[in-house]
């Protein structure tokens, strides 16, 4: 060692050396002991110290053995039993706190840094170390007590007789044994009573922890219900088959903070009360049960932050409903979420400080220093009314949550069920919810299918993979499993929407006469029963962007309500309904802005033309039954049933090719119009009905078909066929395709053996001329019959 002091020199096995080794620092010079010191340590001084230590150890062992057998030191034994009970309470409380996961991750890391023994003590599963000792283990006598009992019994057995002279022997022995027995019974009773008290406090700790966790989960569910209601009111839904019924269709125009107002108030009151009482308990622990400066650092606690800085009405003990309404922006969802986050942090902070206070290390430092330091007394002094307050808040919030979640949404009163208008609003709500759910499930399904298609393209483009691997098969199976719930949910929503529409259609038909209902049925489109196309070829162009739109048409007027129902409402009610409809329009406009821009009619028509390519039109899907065999409903044209039946019978027979062209009156007019090359190539049947109506004004005109061939479809067909003139067969086939609303099922039909040879144009012209003549004669006969019937 050098004569001068060197700061970088550290003696080996010194406290500073051990400290630097624990910190992981090794960049210092180690100075070993000198040879003289080592020599002195190996001489007689060292041997003398060894002998002295051995003598002291033997003497101490003998003294400890005598103390253990001596009744004078029984107080220490009693204290050990009490310490065993207290230690069991500490460990069981720590295990309850750690197992119920009431601590956030930051507090767990802080406990691991400040007192790692808490985590190991809380995970103890041994009954002797992790639980309270049983009554049998407390009342079990030790060796000294058993020896006293054996000595007393031996003295009694040694006596020859129970005489007065022998009373000098057994009398004091009996008195001493009775006193010993009474003291032992009192000690056992005291230990059993203490164990019962500790068990009660252990149950209280467990109940407080469970109530805190249950309250946190219930507040989270309530906030989710509030958020779901707000989301649904704006036109969205969660990943469920049906949207929640907490926001009916009639409430769509309300403000966001007006939904579930009672539940919002209950959440604010209960969370605020629990936050304040947990904060007071934590401050009480910091003030009356201080630990070291590292644990009680103010930067680790939320409770030291002034309540005025937190806001939300937490600084005042009592807050009125109006003040709370103003401080939380009408109990808005962001304010409730901030308050919930404060509660989570404060609750975790309280249990963290309690765990540090009940740690076994603190028990070893201040073991039985005073009766107030016992852990169950500390717990009782700290919590005070906290368990009762938390239980009351949990019950209040649970009652409010169950009311809004179950009673209001599923158990409606009989008056609401019998009210006519509310029933209609409920049906509209169900239909609206089903359509919204269907739209969003289809959107989610489209996204998943796009992802699956990308994965398949990646697998097909990989040249190294000659066969599909096991990982790829599992990946595809997982993707299909993700898609399946959306498909099932879409089917459920579609079926429910159809059922709702069917019920709404059948209800007015039962109340009104047949003529009026048949006129109203003109607005409903004819749904074709033909199966859809299974595949779309790869070369068919598809739109680059497919926007799924789900919205209500803007042309919503007061005519959507029946005139018979107007007298049921007061002027105030009608004004309120008008405001609600205007608010609904505004919300729908916002929803359309969120979902995407509404495509114009021209863009939609362009997408339809691109979607159905030339290959899809020319190569139809061949069903098992002929496409032409469909019958339109009889209630579509109720004015003249005879004419309508004749019209449809002739029209369908012409499609099926079962009758000759001369039996159809409208085909002649159609062929005459088709011969004009300067006119449009295809004339709809609605234009052909005008000359016939001009012949006889008394005769009711033929009603206009509901499906009219648009100009875009004419251009599409003209571009497909690429011919200068369209004959009667192609025109009639186009009419059939327009009425069926499906271009992929277009089948070419023949209407007689004379048209089989398409190459001979002259034969076709002659046949068409004969057909026109036959049609004119048939039309004249028909008009004469109708005049005779009218007379």
Swiss-Prot record:
Keywords: Cell junction, Cell membrane, Coiled coil, Membrane, Nucleus, Transmembrane, Transmembrane helix
Stretches the record annotates as Disordered: 752-791
Coiled-coil annotated spans: 435-464
Record's bilayer topology term: Multi-pass membrane protein
Bilayer-crossing regions: 138-158, 163-183
Ranges of Basic and acidic residues composition bias in the record: 773-783
Annotated compartments: Cell membrane; Cell junction, Adherens junction; Nucleus
A Gene Ontology molecular function term of the record: myosin binding
Keyword Disulfide bond belongs to the record: no
Record's compositionally biased regions (Acidic residues): 752-769
UniProt main location, coarse: membrane
Pfam families cross-referenced by the UniProt entry: Vezatin (PF12632)
GO CC annotations on file: adherens junction; nucleus; plasma membrane; stereocilia ankle link complex
GO biological process terms on file: cell-cell adhesion
UniProt xrefs under InterPro entries: Myosin-bd, Vezatin
Family statement: Belongs to the vezatin family.
Subunit details: Interacts with myosin VIIa and the cadherin-catenins complex.
Protein name as catalogued: Vezatin
Taxonomic source organism: Xenopus tropicalis (Western clawed frog)
Taxonomic classification: Eukaryota, Metazoa, Chordata, Craniata, Vertebrata
UniProt gene name: vezt
């Amino acid at each position: 060692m050098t004569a001068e002091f060197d700061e970088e020199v550290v003696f080996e096995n010194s406290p500073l050396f051990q400290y630097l080794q624990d910190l992981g620092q090794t960049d210092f010079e180690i100075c070993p002991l000198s040879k003289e010191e080592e020599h002195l340590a190996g001489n007689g001084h060292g041997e003398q110290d060894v002998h002295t230590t051995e003598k002291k150890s033997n003497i101490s062992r003998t003294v400890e053995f005598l103390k253990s057998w001596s009744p004078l030191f029984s107080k220490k034994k009693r204290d050990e039993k009490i310490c065993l009970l207290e230690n069991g309470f500490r460990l069981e409380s720590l295990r309850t706190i750690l197992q119920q996961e009431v601590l956030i991750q930051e507090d767990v890391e802080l406990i691991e840094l400040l007192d790692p023994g808490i985590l190991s003590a809380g995970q103890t599963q041994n009954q002797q170390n992790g639980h309270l000792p049983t009554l049998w283990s407390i009342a079990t006598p030790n060796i000294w007590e058993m020896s006293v009992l054996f000595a007393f019994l031996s003295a009694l057995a040694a006596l020859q007789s129970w005489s007065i002279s022998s009373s000098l022997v057994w009398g004091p022995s009996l008195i001493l044994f009775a006193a010993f027995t009474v003291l032992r019974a009192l000690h056992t009773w005291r230990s059993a009573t203490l164990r019962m008290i500790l068990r009660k406090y252990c149950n209280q700790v467990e109940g407080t922890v469970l109530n805190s966790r249950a309250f946190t989960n219930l507040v989270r569910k309530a906030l989710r219900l509030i958020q779901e209601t707000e989301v649904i009111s704006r036109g969205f839904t969660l990943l469920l088959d049906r949207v929640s019924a907490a926001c009916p269709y009639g409430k769509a125009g309300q403000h966001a903070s007006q939904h579930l107002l009672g539940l919002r108030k209950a959440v604010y009151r209960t969370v605020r009360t629990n936050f304040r009482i947990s904060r007071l308990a934590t401050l009480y622990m910091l003030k009356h049960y201080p630990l070291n400066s590292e644990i009680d650092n103010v930067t680790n606690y939320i409770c030291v932050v002034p309540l005025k800085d937190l806001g939300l009405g937490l600084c005042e003990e009592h807050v009125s409903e109006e003040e709370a309404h103003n401080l939380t922006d009408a109990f808005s969802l962001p304010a409730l979420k901030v308050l919930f986050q404060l509660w989570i942090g404060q609750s975790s902070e309280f249990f963290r400080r309690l765990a540090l206070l009940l740690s076994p290390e603190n028990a070893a430092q201040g073991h039985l220093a005073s009766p107030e330091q016992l852990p169950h007394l500390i717990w009782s002094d700290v919590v005070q009314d906290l368990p009762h307050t938390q239980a009351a808040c949990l019950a209040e919030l649970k009652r409010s949550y169950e009311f809004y979640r179950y009673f209001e949404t599923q158990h409606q009163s009989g008056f609401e069920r019998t009210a006519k208008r509310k029933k209609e609003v409920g049906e509209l709500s169900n239909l609206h919810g089903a359509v919204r759910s269907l739209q969003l499930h289809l959107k989610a399904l489209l996204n998943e299918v796009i992802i699956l298609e990308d994965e398949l393209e990646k697998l097909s483009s990989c040249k190294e993979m000659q066969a599909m691997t096991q990982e790829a098969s599992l990946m595809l199976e997982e993707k299909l499993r993700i898609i399946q719930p959306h498909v099932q949910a879409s089917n459920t929503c579609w079926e429910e929407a159809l059922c709702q529409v069917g019920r709404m259609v059948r209800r007015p038909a039962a109340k009104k006469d047949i003529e009026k209902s048949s006129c109203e049925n003109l607005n409903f489109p004819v749904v074709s029963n033909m199966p859809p196309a299974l595949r779309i070829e790869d070369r068919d162009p598809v739109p680059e962007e497919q926007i799924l739109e789900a919205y209500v048409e803007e042309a919503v007027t007061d005519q959507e309500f029946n005139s018979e129902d107007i007298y049921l409402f007061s002027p105030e009610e009608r004004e309120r309904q008008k405001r609600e409809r205007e608010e609904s329009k505004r919300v729908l406009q916002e929803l359309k802005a969120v979902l995407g821009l509404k495509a114009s009619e021209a863009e939609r028509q362009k997408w339809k033309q691109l979607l159905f390519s030339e290959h899809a039109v020319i190569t139809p899907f061949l069903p098992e039954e002929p496409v032409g065999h469909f019958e339109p409903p009889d209630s579509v044209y109720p004015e003249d049933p005879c004419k309508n039946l004749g019209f449809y019978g002739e029209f369908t027979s012409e499609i099926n090719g079962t009758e000759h062209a001369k039996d159809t009156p409208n085909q002649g007019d159609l062929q005459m119009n088709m011969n004009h090359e300067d006119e449009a190539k295809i004339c709809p049947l609605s234009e052909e009905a005008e000359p016939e109506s001009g012949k006889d004004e008394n005769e009711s005109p033929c009603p206009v078909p509901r499906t009219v061939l648009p100009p875009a479809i004419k251009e599409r067909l003209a571009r497909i066929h690429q011919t200068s003139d369209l004959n009667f067969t192609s025109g009639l086939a186009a009419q059939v395709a327009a009425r069926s609303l499906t271009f992929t099922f277009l089948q070419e039909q023949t209407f007689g053996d004379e048209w089989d040879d398409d190459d001979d144009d002259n034969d076709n012209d002659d046949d068409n001329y004969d057909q026109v003549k036959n049609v004119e004669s048939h039309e004249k006969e028909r008009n004469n019959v109708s005049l005779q019937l009218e007379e």
